[in-house]
């Protein structure tokens, strides 16, 4: 059995496998959140990919980082009225969204909807038919994190356990309700604000550190004691 240092070294030295999501027909890819037919890859570096979005309502740019196995982070710069009408269900995936600027409304089946504004955080299960994201001001800047629990490797799970991260508790946030919203909360918000102030030369390492911090904070977070709202679509 590998010790903690060997586990950490394997995870941190491994490079993102950008094709891992394409190895099976039913696998999930974070880019699907935006409607794959509307996406055009415009940049591809060692650690990230940039995509241009466009439909009749406007344009957008997203920057996607494969942070750890099963964990992605996306910077959203959207100037559109809506996107993602083709998202397929993904039973093992949780989507976390932080709104930096603007407003995002998520429309579900049966006309159920929830919204996030600046400073808000949302958790959404993708196990049902995908929702439509609408941007009433045609301007939205924020961060999306996807957790594909089926793709988080055993090595990664052991590292998270050593850091006292409880993945089961985090996944339960979106099991009871399809959409959970936490209104502006300082204990979480500072993590996302710092993700907008990263020196370019340490971007990838810094993102990894902040993702681990977020997972640890969410492990100890009590929704009942905070200003949370729910949509059961």
Where would I find each of the regions flagged by the language model?
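N-terminal low-complexity or simple alpha-helical regulatory segments
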Residues: 1-90
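Short hydrophobic/aromatic-rich motifs at helix boundaries and adjacent loops
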Residues: 33-34, 45, 49, 100-104, ...
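Generic structural motif
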Residues: 67, 78-83, 101-103, 148-152
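Short hydrophobic beta-strand segments that form the core of ligand-binding sensory/regulatory domains
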Residues: 75-77, 95-99, 141-148
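Glycine- and acidic-residue-biased ligand/ion/polar-headgroup-sensing regions
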Residues: 90-111, 149
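Alpha-helical bundle regulatory/interaction domains
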Residues: 107-232
